[in-house]
């Protein structure tokens, strides 16, 4: 057990120590504010305070983890043996920066609570992040890299210290705002959409609609079980998320009033544990969100613990507080829609730290490093290269690679290409 002395144990410090030591390093670490207990401890130990107690392993503390305010921070990048970092420390410290404060700043999404310019959907823009100030930083899981470099420093200081190894994992997050392209629509809707296709000379779409609706061919978007088999053979987990809501002209989704759509979701749920995709309208109406979640749980006869927020609209802290209130356990929305990279600078799932309430919440956040929106304009070869590059970063720290794809993107690229992409990163 690694003992960490600090002059004050705070929720912020406890949160970041758990992530760095337990989740990434695989080590048991405990905090103490007792000098006597620290001196008596015979095992590996370090001090996180303004001054060292003796000549022990020492990291000089930044005030960020002992404060309750949310205010702008001075971020100045430097290099630590090829890894960018900030919150630089002087030579008295055993490592050149405050790894705890820097990690907390990124994991808690501290910068998203500060004044910033949002995009058209009210989202935090990647260009606003401190990670965009350092070239290449956003495409590296810095928190994991920092933790492993701290681990190396501790092994050097305490030979024989034990750490549990972890395994590299790949998860595919499949989002389906509109679960089908043609199936389960009303006759009037088919007629209306057919006239639109005809007016725009989209004869291929007209043919596909005819084959699906009249001849009973499989819907082009119905690729869920077809993708499940090859991914399972590669040891990759597939997490499908479906919208279950009223019809919305923007989403062009299938309404929850269609009983056949409900039967379809039950069928998929027999093979895969499906999650709830919060609709655009429900993002703006908490009451509607609760209704959608309740109706989908009633349909499947089980609680829904996994959620994706449509269009990565994780507006902190409100969006996550609403999930916590409904006892949602896992979120798969922490990423950028149109930028490849790590929004929270980690590839390790972590609990949501609520800066508004200063408490670690029971909501596990899965960082998404690549979304279909960022891949959409790229050709097959470029997509594969981009995925391999960022997957290698995750492999280097044995983290979790989360790739988010929509059913529309899968239909566009084809199952063969998607399988090829996943195989390249496994």
Language-model segment annotations:
Residues 1-256, 348-349, 355-426:
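Terminal accessory/targeting
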Residues 13, 281-359, 412-415:
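Catalytic domains of cell-wall/extracellular-matrix polysaccharide-remodeling enzymes
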Residues 20-24, 230, 267, 295, ...:
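Alpha-helical structural signal in soluble globular domains
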Residues 29-30, 238-239, 275, 305, ...:
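A local structural micro-motif
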Residues 136, 273-275, 339-343, 399:
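Glycine-centered flexibility motif
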Residues 175-177, 277, 307, 323, ...:
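Conserved, mostly hydrophobic/aromatic
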């Amino acid at each position: 057990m690694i003992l960490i002395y600090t002059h004050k144990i705070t929720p912020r410090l406890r949160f970041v120590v758990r992530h760095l030591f337990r989740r990434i390093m695989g080590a048991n670490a405990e905090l103490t504010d007792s000098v006597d207990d620290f001196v008596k401890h015979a095992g590996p130990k370090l001090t996180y305070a303004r001054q060292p107690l003796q000549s022990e392993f020492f990291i000089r503390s930044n005030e960020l983890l002992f404060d309750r305010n949310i205010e702008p921070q001075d971020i100045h990048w430097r290099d630590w043996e090829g890894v960018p970092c900030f919150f630089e420390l002087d030579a008295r410290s055993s490592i050149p920066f405050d790894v705890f404060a820097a990690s907390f700043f990124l994991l808690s999404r501290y910068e998203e609570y500060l004044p910033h310019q949002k995009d058209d959907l009210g989202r935090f823009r990647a260009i606003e992040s401190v990670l965009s100030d350092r070239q290449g930083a956003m495409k590296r899981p810095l928190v994991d890299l920092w933790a492993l470099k701290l681990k190396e420093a501790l092994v050097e200081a305490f030979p024989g210290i034990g750490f549990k190894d972890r395994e590299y994992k790949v998860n595919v997050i499949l989002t389906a705002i509109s679960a089908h392209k043609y199936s389960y629509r009303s006759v009037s809707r088919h007629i209306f959409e057919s006239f639109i296709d005809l007016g725009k000379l989209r004869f291929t779409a007209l043919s596909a609609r005819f084959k699906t609706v009249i001849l009973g061919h499989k819907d082009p978007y119905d690729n869920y079980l077809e993708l499940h088999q090859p991914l399972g053979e590669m040891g990759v987990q597939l997490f499908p998320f479906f919208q279950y809501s009223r019809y919305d002209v923007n989403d062009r989704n299938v309404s929850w009033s269609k009983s056949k759509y409900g039967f379809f979701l039950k069928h998929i749920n027999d093979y895969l544990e499906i999650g709830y995709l919060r609709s655009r309208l429900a993002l703006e109406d908490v009451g509607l969100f609760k209704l959608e979640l309740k109706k989908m749980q009633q349909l499947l006869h089980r609680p829904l613990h996994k959620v994706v927020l449509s269009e990565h609209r994780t507006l902190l802290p409100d969006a996550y507080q609403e999930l916590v209130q409904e006892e949602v356990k896992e979120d798969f929305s922490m990423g950028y829609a149109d930028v490849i990279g790590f929004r929270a600078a980690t590839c390790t799932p972590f609990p949501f730290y609520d800066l508004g309430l200063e408490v670690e919440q029971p909501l596990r956040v899965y960082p998404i490093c690549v979304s279909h929106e960022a891949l959409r304009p790229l050709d097959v070869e470029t997509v594969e290269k981009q995925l391999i590059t960022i997957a290698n970063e995750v492999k280097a720290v044995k983290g979790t690679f989360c790739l988010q794809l929509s059913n529309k993107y899968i239909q566009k690229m084809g199952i063969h290409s998607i399988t090829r992409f996943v195989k390249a990163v496994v």
